[in-house]
Amino acid sequence: MEIGLREWLIVIGIIVIAGILFDGWRRMRGGKGKLKFRLDRSFSNLPDEEETTSAEVLGPPRVLDTHKEPQLDEHDLPSMSANPRDNKRGAGSEKRGDKKRKDEPQQGDLNLDLDGPSLFTARDDDFPDDKPAQRITEDKDLPPVEEVLVISVISRNEGGFKGPALLQNILESGLRFGEMDIFHRHESMAGNGEVLFSMANAVKPGVFDLDDIDHFSTRAVSFFLGLPGPRRPKQAFDVMVAAARKLAHELDGELKDDQRSVMTAQTIEHYRQRIVEFERRALTQRRG
C-alpha cells in the first residue's frame, strides 16, 4: 500500500512532537541539580538576622540612635606623615594577616616610580606606640600632613559590615593590613612601594583585629588620603574612590564625604580641585 502525502505529514508531525517532549524532559532533569547550587557568594557572609549595635562612632561623645547613621569625624582619624621605614614594619604585620587571606585575587599595580616614601603614622593619644621616642626621631624632619581627603562608607544594614566579607572585598581592591592595625593601599598590589591611601575602622578604637576577624563587624569604615602624601595624588585619589565604590556596591553601603553628606559626582570633583589647589600652592612655595 502506497503512503500518501497526508500520511507522511502525520508521521513527521508525531516525530517532531516526540522530539520536543523528550528535549523538554531532558532539560527539566538536568536543571534540577543546577538550581540547588546557584548561590550568590556576595551574600554568604551576611547575618542570619538583623543585629543592633550601640557602638560609638569616632567623634565627640554622643548618644546614638541605632536607627540613625553613625556620626563620623575626620578629626579622630589617625594623623599621617611620610615615613621611609614603614614598609619594613608593615612586612611583619602583614605576615599576621596572611593566615586569614589565602588565594587573594591579583590585580594590576599602579604605575608609579619608587623613589619617594610616603606612609601614615599614628597619633600617640589615639594609637599607643611601643617606641615613641624612635618614631619622633624618625619623623622630625618629615613634612606634616596639611590636608586629609576622607571618604566614609556606612553600612545600610544595622548589623554592619561583617569581617570576612569586608576583608575579602578590600583585599580585592589591593589594600593590605599593616602599620597601626589598619589597611593601606600601596602602589603595588603586593604591598610594596609608597602608600597611596589608608582605610581605618570608623568605629572606636579605629583598628581591625585580624585574629578575630570572623566575629568582627563595623557600621562604617573611612578611606583617607593625606596631602602631602603620594607623589601623584590625583591618580591615588581615583584608586581610593574606586575602592570605596566597590565596597559600597558589593556590601550595601553608602558613600559619605568629610562633612557627613552623601558623596556625589560634584563632591568627588571638588576633592580633585582641592588636590589641584594643594599642588599649585606647593609649587608656588618651592619657587618662592
UniProtKB/Swiss-Prot annotation:
Residues 1 are periplasmic. It is found in: Cell inner membrane. Residues 64-77, 85-105, 122-138 have a biased composition (Basic and acidic residues). Residues 23-288 are cytoplasmic. Residues 48-138 are annotated as: Disordered. InterPro entries: Cell_div_ZipA (IPR011919), ZipA_FtsZ-bd_C (IPR007449), ZipA_FtsZ-bd_C_sf (IPR036765). The chain crosses the membrane at residues 2-22. GO terms for biological process: division septum assembly; FtsZ-dependent cytokinesis. HAMAP family: ZipA (MF_00509). Interacts with FtsZ via their C-terminal domains. This is Cell division protein ZipA. It comes from Pseudomonas syringae pv. tomato (strain ATCC BAA-871 / DC3000). The gene is zipA.
